[in-house]
Amino acid sequence: MLVLLSSVWLLTTSSSAQVEPAPAEGALTTLGTLKSKKITESSGLARSHFIEDAWWTMNDSGHGTAVYMFGDKGQTIADCNLKNAKNRDWEAMASFQRDGKNYLLVADVGDNVSRRERCQLYIFEEPKFKPKKKKSYSKKLKATRLEFRYEDGPRNCEAVACVPDGESVFLIEKIFLETNKRRHPGIYELKLPPLKPPLNEDEDGQDEENTMLVAKRIASFPFRGVTGMSISPNGKRLVIRNYLSAHLFERVAVDGKLPTWEQVFRDSKPKSVPMPLQVQGEAICFTRDNNHLIVTSETARQTIWKVNVASQQESQDDVHQEEPTTTNGIEQSATPLKTTEAQ
């Protein structure tokens, strides 16, 4: 949802949080500007399985049920609609593969007042097509609707990510102010059931009665104001962002065995990955090479940024060892960044 520019500074670290700085060399890169007038609140991002350097996005609540694919220069490649979906408060997207098929997920999980007893995930096969230079691909897509609730009551959420094989979805609640009930935002895991075919069928059909799924709290996250999350294609990196920065978790094998994400959240410290300063930066997504991030903002004609997660400035070592400053009782942190233009 739209917020005042000043509110991006009301962020979100806990003074007790410890963050390891990411390796330092390199800079942010601007790729282009989203050209579509229809994309005014890019709230989520999902990597395309079929087209390199292309991503799917969608608008926040109040903008219908369209999903858009754009290229690295900001050009619109596809403009599709989910014909059997509703946009109560869409906040995130993800992509995954399952049973030899390529899927996209749209998460209707926004709940600013934390009153929703059930939320929805819309899952559909990514359409495969040959892009055209002067005309965007358009099709009505049918999605499978999954309904879920949180085990400990309604939660506001803007960050959702799916593991590459589509077995689990992770969600993080968005909290600005500390409360007596929960100091840190919860990280939740939702196990996905087998997907019911057919998806993207041309005929209209009635949704079967859905079994209510339950998202279980598996860990806490030491930073507030979370707006986006993504898992790398190889399943070894997970990034969580807020309006000013991002935090990178990595699965490192021990005795030849990778830990679960629950173990990583519990036992490891995230590395800091600063974000470009945006009016309302929310969406984030890994690229195919597992080493870069694409980030957008909830404003019209926003800049598309590319971030190298393995290349940040050495000065962060000192920045993240300092105590965060506080404004109006809300702790905040900001890191100046060097940027470069893509050639």
Spans of features found by a protein language model:
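Bacterial N-terminal signal peptides
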Residues: 1-9
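N-terminal signal peptide c-region/cleavage motif recognized by signal peptidases
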Residues: 12-14
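Sequence/structural signature of beta-propeller domains
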Residues: 18-343
